[in-house]
């Protein structure tokens, strides 16, 4: 499996997927699926986490992703909610633009700043891997990291830059 960061450097897994799969949600936390109308929530989390430097750019990006998936976000984008039902994080999987068939990308990992560095990013990555398992014909996963914190998280989970 490979990982790609924003600078287009690649990574691969060290066969340490047990670090990813052996996660459980804290009491009261849950995953909810993205639904049409959730665009502002998604953009707010992405912008707050520093994935996008401009809120409007984040809004444009989610609509672009919706269009490319023709609105079929089922099992493609999720939110992590805390015990109060507040959406605090999100992650998405999309078909890769590479010419190789069956490649899925894990993208847009983001957590609100006060929830970062608490192990919750690992939960989102675990959920994304499980979502990829449900994609028919998925053969490989690319990871995309947009900031240094995401890159460090992926490396701590056993991925290496190629």
Predicted regions and their residues:
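A short beta-loop-alpha structural element at the N-terminal edge
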Residues: 30-42
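Extended, hydrophobic alpha-helical segments in both membrane/secreted and soluble proteins
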Residues: 105-106, 141, 150
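Acyl-donor-binding surface of acyltransferase catalytic domains
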Residues: 1-28, 35
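Conserved acetyl-CoA-binding loop-helix of GNAT-fold acetyltransferases
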Residues: 111, 117-132, 156
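A conserved beta-strand-loop-helix scaffold within acyl/acetyltransferase catalytic domains
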Residues: 47-111
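Conserved GNAT acetyl-CoA-binding A-motif
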Residues: 132-146
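Conserved active-site alpha-helix within GNAT-family acetyltransferase domains
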Residues: 122, 147-162
């Amino acid at each position: 499996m490979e990982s790609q960061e924003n600078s287009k450097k690649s990574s691969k897994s060290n066969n340490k997927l047990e670090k990813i799969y052996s996660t459980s949600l804290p009491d009261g936390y849950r995953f909810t699926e993205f639904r049409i109308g959730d665009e502002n929530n998604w953009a707010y989390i992405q912008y707050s986490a520093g994935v996008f430097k401009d809120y409007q750019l984040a809004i444009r990006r989610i609509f672009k992703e919706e269009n490319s998936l023709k609105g079929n976000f089922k099992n493609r984008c999720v939110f992590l909610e805390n015990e109060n039902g507040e959406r605090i994080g999100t992650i998405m999987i999309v078909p890769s633009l590479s010419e190789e068939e069956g490649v899925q990308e894990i993208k847009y990992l983001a957590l609100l700043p006060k929830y970062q560095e608490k192990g919750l990013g690992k939960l989102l990555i675990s959920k994304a891997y499980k979502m990829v398992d449900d994609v028919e014909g998925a053969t490989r996963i690319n990871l995309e990291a947009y900031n240094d914190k995401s890159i460090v998280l992926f490396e701590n989970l056993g991925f290496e830059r190629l």
